[in-house]
Amino acid sequence: FPYTTLFRSDTVFTPGSRFQYGGLAMQIAGRMAEVAMEKEFETLFQELLAQPLEMKNSHFTPINTDGGHAPMLGGGLCTTLNDYIHFLSMIYHEGTYEGKRILTAETVKEMQANQVKDALVSPGEYTEIALGQSHTGIYGLGEWRELIDKKTGEAYQISSPGWAGAYPWINKRDSVYGFFIAHVVGPSAKEDGFSSFYGSPVISRTVSEIVK
């Protein structure tokens, strides 16, 4: 949908008082970047990330092709396994890729920090259903904080799963990261109870068990 429609929408609660995951926040962040840099989001993505990360087959798509629609930032990335693993490598290595500094280490740390803080977290969020985790610091900036070090409060496993079967994750404690893609036909929640979204963490657990 156009940004003008988004900005006319009313907030449903005071910012910072409650956590509720949703792609609208990503749309607003994308528009903020456009205004600050005076460039369209796709141009920013290509110049700042895709090109230096050699993601030659990656771009963002709008919700539909009718015209007048902004890129869909929460789920609208068209990419490949090989392209996306370059991005994960950069995040895993604290902002560097092939010796090039893409993001500052401080930026990556802030992305993975607890952004929920004292906000109310309602039952049934992703980490609770998928991992049985009931901690409140479940989300950073565009990343789920799946597994937390109880002593430091730092997330040692982060992810950004998609409803249609994409599961990228990084586990810093086990020194492993990966990207699993599955083609899911129809709704992600099947009649037999399987959900490609909530079932994703079994992949990271299996990989960690193998590398150990």
Mark where each language-model region is.
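Catalytic-site signature segments of enzymes, centered on catalytic residues
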Residues: 4-81, 85
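C-terminal soluble interaction/assembly domains
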Residues: 180-187
